[in-house]
Every structure is written in C-alpha cells, then in structure tokens.
C-alpha cells in the first residue's frame, strides 16, 4: 500500500508506514464518518497535517485501487525504541461536514429541493467532489430546525433520511455520495464479493508491513 499526500488534490509527497506500526484502513458502515485511517509512519517534515489529505492506494495484479481520501485529525510524534515515528489518525472526507458547524439558525425555504439543500451544505462544508442522486422531493414548509452550532453532517443526514436516502458516504476514489436507500435483492446485485486476501472484509482490516 502506498500512502500519497495530496495538496490541492495533487500528489505532493508520500508517507512510509513503519513495519509493525499497525497502518490500517477500517470501515464502519453504521458510523457517521465511516472510513478511518490510522497507524505509525516515518516522519516527513514536508507534510502539513493541518491541510494535506492522505490517500492510500493498494495495488493488486498491477491495478492501482485507491482506498479513499483522509483528513488528519490527530498527528503526533512518539518514539518506537530509538526512532521517532508519527502516529496518525485520519477520517474520510465526510469528516469535513462533521467539523463544519452552522453559525446562525439555518433557514430552508418551502419548495426547496431536498437534494439542492444537501448539495449546498456539502459545499459549505468544503466538500467539492460529491454525487447527490436526483430527487424531485421538496420541503413542504419553511424549516428552521437546527440551532447554531449544529454540525452540517447531522443536518445533511437528517434531510437525507426524510427522503429515504442513506447517510452520506465516501467511495474509494474520494467522492462523497448521497443516494437513495434500496432494499437488498438479487436483482440489485452490482458487485460480487470474494473471500480471501482480496475481500472487502480483508481490506477493511489490512495491516501493512513495509
């Protein structure tokens, strides 16, 4: 696995995972922010952990497969024996919406498309790469439900639930999605999962030794 450091969405540098450092990408489907990256890495003085984005990329059979984009939330230096290491925790791009809070009571006008309101909140959160599935549902009354200080992720997911959409989630390429809930059925199968080392479950628990 390669750990790219993105600056302005362009590869700027790379992080090197330490052997035995527990570098891992995990997915928790029912969490508000679903993807997480954690582990210990070699120090890299060129990385700005306040603004840069981390993108793990897994190569299988010569095909590069990105595993999302991550916002560092906790980065500090510790010592592993005689060597200094960077201990890092980061979360997927929906974390931007969780950390973005409204400063005044949010007003949503009657007749506003739910999807338009969700798109506006995503942009206000700093999320620019997103896909919101089209829907003609509109607000049936003026809304001022959310107090100042409410995070935008809470509002987005509440609006999504009202039109039977899933909570927002990030795909492997780093695009944030808001899409309609669909009941599982054989007709709806679009992805086939395998067991073994290439399974999604394996990837969600992968530990890297470099």
Each predicted region: which residue ranges?
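Hydrophobic beta-strand residues in large extracellular and virion-surface proteins
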Residues: 3-5, 37-39, 54-58, 72, ...
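Sterically constrained small-residue positions within well-ordered secondary structures
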Residues: 28-32, 47, 63, 79-81, ...
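Surface-exposed cap/loop segments at beta↔alpha junctions
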Residues: 42-129
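Short beta-strand-centered interaction patches in the first periplasmic/extracellular domains
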Residues: 74-97, 131-205
């Amino acid at each position: 696995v390669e750990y790219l450091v993105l600056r302005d969405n362009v590869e700027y540098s790379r992080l090197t995972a330490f052997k035995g450092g527990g570098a891992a990408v995990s997915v928790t489907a029912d969490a508000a922010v679903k993807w997480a990256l954690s582990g210990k890495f070699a120090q890299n003085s060129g990385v700005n952990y306040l603004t840069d984005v981390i993108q793990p990329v897994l190569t299988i059979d010569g095909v590069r497969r990105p595993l999302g984009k991550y916002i560092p939330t906790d980065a500090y230096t510790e010592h592993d024996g005689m060597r200094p290491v960077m201990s890092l925790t980061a979360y997927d791009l929906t974390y931007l919406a969780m950390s973005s809070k409204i400063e005044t009571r949010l007003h949503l006008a009657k007749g506003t498309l739910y999807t338009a309101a969700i798109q506006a909140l995503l942009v206000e959160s700093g999320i620019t790469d997103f896909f919101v599935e089209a829907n003609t549902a509109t607000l049936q009354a003026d809304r001022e439900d959310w107090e100042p200080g409410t995070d935008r992720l809470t509002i987005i997911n509440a609006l999504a639930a009202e039109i039977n959409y899933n909570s927002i989630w990030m795909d492997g390429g780093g695009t944030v999605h808001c899409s309609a809930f669909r009941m599982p059925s054989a007709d709806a199968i679009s992805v086939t999962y395998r067991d073994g080392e290439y399974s999604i479950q394996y990837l969600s628990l992968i530990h890297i030794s470099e």
